[in-house]
């Protein structure tokens, strides 16, 4: 607002000067003249009475003002950087979950002998549980048997006892030098039981994948609370993460189907 100027009584009593040509509005035929813009004139003054004067002011009040903080939109580069870190970590963990499922499937025996059948066997060796493969060499001389040769022959009986207790459906025999494990043909009922075991292991893997996805979503939500991502950003990133989750779910289903086919093969 331009400053107010006080003038003398004599000046106030003087007749007002005519508006300059710049302040006049040109006349046009058929048009109503507009009001002259006297507020913009350099000769515009406010006449005040002589004597003490006081000026009052009030604070400016903005109507309908929005006091909420405005979220700065993240750049594409920032969004991609956050996505890369979180999604890469999720993929890495999901890959490990797939490996775990595959290793668990390998322990489920089919109609053929496979050293992986004994991967979960742990022997109480000198008071400490150790994996069988760390204290013995395991070979496959033929399709129906395994040959276990311990590095310490004193552990033969302990290994034999542990294999029997594992209830793998195999028959170990100890000749004092090695342990021969005979893998009998699978019966129809046994195949069905093993198929259920495979389905259970697959579901455990899917649960692990879902938990990994949940952790990644929590990481995105944390960035939203920190004002580093918007709600729309999180929705888009969550949708991309769901595609990754679906991808690994299909991988589990594929290896599960493959294992079930091996079980049903006679």
Swiss-Prot record:
Transit peptide: first to last position: 1-74
Q: Which spans does this entry mark as compositional bias, Low complexity?
A: 1-26
Check the record and name the PANTHER family matching this protein. MITOCHONDRIAL RIBOSOME RECYCLING FACTOR PSEUDO 1, RIBOSOME RECYCLING FACTOR
Decide whether keyword Protein biosynthesis is in the record.
yes
Could you state one GO biological process linked to this protein? plastid translation
Tell me where the signal peptide lies.
Answer: none
Keywords (alphabetical) are: Chloroplast, Coiled coil, Plastid, Protein biosynthesis, Transit peptide
Q: What GO molecular function annotation could you give as one example from this UniProt entry?
A: ribosomal large subunit binding
The function of this protein is: Responsible for the release of ribosomes from messenger RNA at the termination of chloroplastic protein biosynthesis.
- What are the leading ranks of the lineage? Eukaryota, Viridiplantae, Streptophyta, Embryophyta, Tracheophyta
Coiled coil start-end = 75-109, 207-266
Q: What is its main location?
A: plastid
One of the record's GO cellular component terms: chloroplast
Q: Where in the cell is it found?
A: Plastid, Chloroplast
InterPro entries (UniProt xref): Ribosome_recyc_fac, Ribosome_recyc_fac_dom, RRF_sf
Query: Member of which family?
Result: Belongs to the RRF family.
Name the record gives this protein: Ribosome-recycling factor, chloroplastic
Using the UniProt annotation, give all residue ranges assigned to the region (Disordered). 1-30
